[in-house]
Design a protein with these regions (language model features):
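Active-site Gly/Thr loop motif
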Residues: 143, 150-162
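Residues in well-ordered beta-strands of folded domains
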Residues: 81, 146-148
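Primarily short, surface-exposed interaction patches in extracytoplasmic proteins
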Residues: 1-139, 158, 164-173, 186-262, ...
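Globin-like tetrapyrrole-binding proteins
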Residues: 266
């Protein structure tokens, strides 16, 4: 039930911590029984269950509305007549940014890591001595799963994107939409660094032609080619940013050209698209 919840935003039983009389009834009881018995018979292999769910027609549905009567008959989508649009968790969003830029360190296991914070994030900490940055720079881009979590202190980016307090049970994470989330994507130095890295990757893999660069950014970050309208708008934006490229992005090498600066800003804009942060 909880693995189903991770993929669909809601479990087959919505009260994930309560299967008793006070909890809700399952929306698909026979499906829940079938998944549970199959999971046990398969040796409790979580990856196989993920694969089974993600290959299903139900998971691969669009989140767009179908027939008008669907909304009338099942407004909460409990019967799963469409996909629930779901925002990535904080850790997954961190991973997505670094995977797109090509800097994600996918090493498994080991102790918690402590990535560097921006100056304003450090200034906001009450107990700054808790955040001792890992000495090895290669550790700074580990998966979000490995970032240090303390009971009384959370990684600021995770705090902004609704990571729960780890001192109490949390059956379902809250999903908020607040201004600090947009400000993190637009202004945080770590996102700037990854935008610069993505721009460098695109130049290396797609060459120097702007249309090819734009198409490659879309394929890396969004998993698809841009529409003709998106490609046209992105090309105009890239040309305008190149003309205006005077202020340098943080951590951009001095050798980066105006085109490189403009491309990095375009990559930053793509990181901030709703489509990048949501499973649709």
């Amino acid at each position: 039930n909880r693995i189903w919840q991770w993929h669909f935003g809601k479990g087959l039983v919505e009260t994930a911590n309560d299967f008793g009389k006070m909890g809700q009834l399952p929306s698909h009881p026979r499906l829940l029984d079938w998944l549970a018995t199959g999971f046990a018979a398969d040796g409790w292999k979580v990856k196989n269950l993920h694969r089974l769910i993600m290959h299903s027609n139900t998971y691969r549905q669009s989140s767009r509305f179908g027939k008008k009567d669907h909304l009338t008959r099942d407004p909460d989508n409990r019967l799963l007549w469409r996909m629930n649009r779901r925002r990535l968790e904080a850790e997954a969003l961190w991973d997505a940014v670094h995977l797109s830029s090509g800097t994600l360190n996918a090493t498994l296991g080991g102790p918690p890591v402590v990535p560097p914070l921006a100056a304003d994030e450090i200034a906001s900490l009450r107990e700054k001595w808790h955040w001792v940055v890992s000495a090895d720079p290669a550790q700074h881009t580990r998966r979000g799963l490995y970032i240090l979590v303390r009971r009384n202190f959370k990684f600021p980016m995770f705090d902004v994107f609704d990571t729960p307090v780890n001192s109490v049970s949390c059956p379902t994470r809250d999903v908020t939409t607040v201004a600090p989330q947009a400000l993190w994507g637009l202004n945080n130095e770590s996102v700037f660094r990854q935008a610069v890295q993505l721009a460098g990757r695109v130049v290396k893999e797609a060459g120097s032609e702007a249309p090819a660069q734009i198409g490659h950014v879309w394929k890396i970050a969004l998993g698809r080619s841009p529409t003709s309208r998106e490609a046209s708008s992105a090309l105009k934006l890239l040309e305008e940013l190149e003309r205006q490229a005077t202020a340098r992005l943080p951590d951009a090498p001095q050798a980066v050209t105006n085109r490189g600066q403009a491309l990095a800003k375009l990559c930053l804009a793509v990181f901030n698209l709703s489509e990048f942060a949501f499973v649709d």
